[in-house]
Amino acid sequence: MARARRRQRKTRRKKTRPAPKRRIRVTVPRPTRAETLLLALAKDLAGAPLDGALRKLADAFAPSAELPREVYGAWIKSRREKTASLALSWAREQVRLSLEETIAHSPRGRPAVGLTPDMLAWLLLAACEAIAHEPPSAVADRVRIVLELSGHAAQGG
């Protein structure tokens, strides 16, 4: 006769507790002074009419203003630190987006250049950032040019 096969006993598995999850400490770096200034500027630009917003932006990047020095210092420090670099770029992008919104909601017509609001915002922000490198005597002329580029120059020059 063939050997009868023995039935294997069914054993219950012991319930094991999952290993306790290790708490990961996340440290959020404090925002730099440049980030704080850029975000405050973005907030100020949000509700202002375009010509006023451009004047605020140009004033913020004037050669004697604090913002250009702070941004440059933060940029130098963040060159080897990805998180700091991204945070600074994000803060600058908030200024550009705020300016873009202001341009899009502006009651006046499109600028003579025919740019979309996002491209015009980028161009105007770059122009205002460049004002920091101009001699103080040329700032008023540069602001006038920025206003003309936007299509929001005062009537009669």
Where do the PLM segments sit?
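Hydrophobic/aromatic-rich alpha-helical bundle segments in the mid-to-C-terminal region
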Residues: A84-S85, S106-G157
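Hydrophobic alpha-helical connector segments
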Residues: T32-L67, T116-L124
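Hydrophobic core segments within long, regular secondary-structure runs in both alpha-
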Residues: E35, L54, A58, R96, ...
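Amphipathic alpha-helical packing segments from all-alpha helical-bundle domains
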Residues: A62-G73, K82-R108, D118, D141-I145
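Helix-turn-helix
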Residues: M1-A2, R9, R13-T36
